[in-house]
Amino acid sequence: MKTKTILLSLLCIVGITTATAQSDVYYWKDGKAVKLETVDSLTFNAPEHFDFAAQWVDLGLSVKWARTNVGAAGMTDYGTYFAWGETTGWTSDTNYAKNNFEWTERDVDALVDENLTLLLSRDAAHANWGGSWRMPTREEFQELKDNCTWTWYDDYHHTGVAGYYIASNKPGFTDNYIFLPAGDLFVGPNKPNPKKEHPIGYYWSSTLHTHGYDYAFYLELRDSRCVVDEATSEFGMLVRPVLAE
């Protein structure tokens, strides 16, 4: 019987599923999950360095989505919390209040373009990852909602992290997915509590709300629903970058 041994970096493996005596092995290539055929053994080599920022997922949408949040070490890591329009993450000792902002309501016009979208210079994803990475717009969050299947996990793959497994519904892309961990948020001096009984996730968009200069759109994740809503911009939320080509 012909055998095949595959040497793969540990973090490049998408998943291994077992049914009776057979195993299906997938690896990550060019933003897609690719199935390996006739695999009898695997050898894992730990990489010296893995650039998560370089890993994107093609869900068949208008933009590609990052596998991780800004500041995260992996898919289930929450990453860094940002106030809207700020590019430096705040620490757990910081009070997310308006008097600690770099900007005020009076100069918010200098942060956005004519479409009320954050300038790249004020975009946390672009400032931290560079290249063509940026924060998603309100419309791109809605596109993600409308074209994917969203499955809530209280404990994703026994990591202790709650969040949504989001799989594409687009033909040709249905094996591709991202995971958005529910990391809660900073509200004034109150710190995130992602381990509470009913975790919630909050992700900033780059879109300013039209009815007030101190509000911006965000994606809210709950076990019962996910919605695009608006919130006051000093809240500390997570950022999931998108890649616009």
Region locations from a protein language model:
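Sec-dependent signal peptide cleavage junction
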Residues: 20-52
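Conserved positions within compact, well-structured domain cores
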Residues: 47-245
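Bacterial Sec-dependent N-terminal signal peptides
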Residues: 1-25
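Compositionally biased amphipathic helical and low-complexity segments enriched in hydrophobic
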Residues: 8-12, 37, 60
